[in-house]
Amino acid sequence: MKNNFAKWKPYFFLAILLLSLIPLIWLGRYNYPTGDDYYYGAETHLVWQQTGSIIQTLDAACAGVADSYQIWQGTYSALFLMYLAPNAFSNTAYHLVTFVILLLLCGGIFYLLCPLFRRFLPGTCGEWITVSSILSFLCIQTVEFQCDSFYWYNGSMYYTGFFAVTLFFLGTLFRYLDNGKRILLLPLLLFAVFLGGGNYVSLLPCMLLSVTITLLLLLQKNKKAYICGITSVVLLLSFAVSAMAPGNHVRQSGMWKIPAWKAIAKCLLQGIRYTFAWTGLWWVLAALLLLPVFLRILQKKNGAFFSHPILFTGYAYGLFCSMSCPLFYTMNSTGPGRAVAIVYYMFLLISFTVFFYWIGFVLLKMQARPNPPERIEVSGKLNTARYLAMAVLLFSILCTGLWQETSAMKAIRVLTDGEAAAYAAEYEDRLLLLNDPEVTDVVLTPFIHQPALIYTGDLPGDPEDPTSRKVAQYFQKTSLYVNYGNN
């Protein structure tokens, strides 16, 4: 019976993950575009309406990227996706945003961990599924700012989406390091060019890790250094193309920019704050769940790799803190919630990697003693203590109401209290007005229902605001704004 349960345990964790995603994806049915979704999608939407041609719509998106590169920002691949917002083609397509973002994030985590656990570590398929499911659950269910991270297309794709693609890039890089197949150079270069035009928050640690791997391979005189080196160079050049855009200087002129050394100091300090804030009940519970899995894997692994815990921890902390550098450098702050969200994902991945490494170090020291035990595992009284600790943690999570703050529970509340359906009904009424050809000057009323998770914000109250003018262009109106006077 015990062996049968152990066999099915990975699929139990996978089932919990999948079930927890259902409310989030279902809530996506009531999700609608706003703000920058209309701003960037205006030209492509009109071209699609007038021609129905994918080629001409893509051409309009490329023209938009070229224009924004000169006057606003250099993140070319991110801009391309912004101009191709789902609402440019159909509001129904916008309902799929959450599904796509969650699929990318979960897929990225599973894809990255597969070569690590199945090739570099002697892990089983079940152990890979277990670790991937638990980390995916934590990333999605315990992150704050779910609205910007999973529902608002412009913000979620720019941050969570690109972070997920970064995981796919690293997963492909690790596959190359394992099998040495040069055919992987093509996807690596495509990923590098794409990521170079994305957000700098997830790009910076990716570049640091890629360059570090290349240098280590060069020191070992490993022939794989050439492919990794080419990939790193393309990644750096793509970043340079993005960073040197004239539009960046225009945009940053209105931001509170600080010296680089001060940004580095602030991000190192912020990393400490994040670590204390995010190492909570959920993290400890996950660590206890993963402890026996990590022990099983590590006892099949050569322990020499785990002999430098301080150096490894310091490097991992540097990678983690590097994510905050672009935010402090350009904004002198931790950035918007959607940016903090991907820093949180990175914290989870790195902190559990460090946890895994330190367990390996402890095992290495234990095995170096005279007459070391043949096998170290969580059993007997130690296992009883682990189960007791997990029970206490679960009880604390229930009593403190922490479980109610998970993304799934928030989605369930919005679905069951009728707020989501009421908001969708209001939005559909607004669309009837916006699509009425006889109304050319549109004055909108604010939304009465503003459900958490799917309500990002409304349109401006000034008809001369750039966003108001873009939305008016989108719906082919003379003017458009929201009248907040009665609120």
Region spans (language model):
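Membrane-interface micro-motifs in multi-pass membrane enzymes
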Residues: 36, 124-174, 199, 322-356
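Transmembrane catalytic cores of multi-pass membrane glycosyltransferases
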Residues: 27-88, 92-98, 153, 196-339
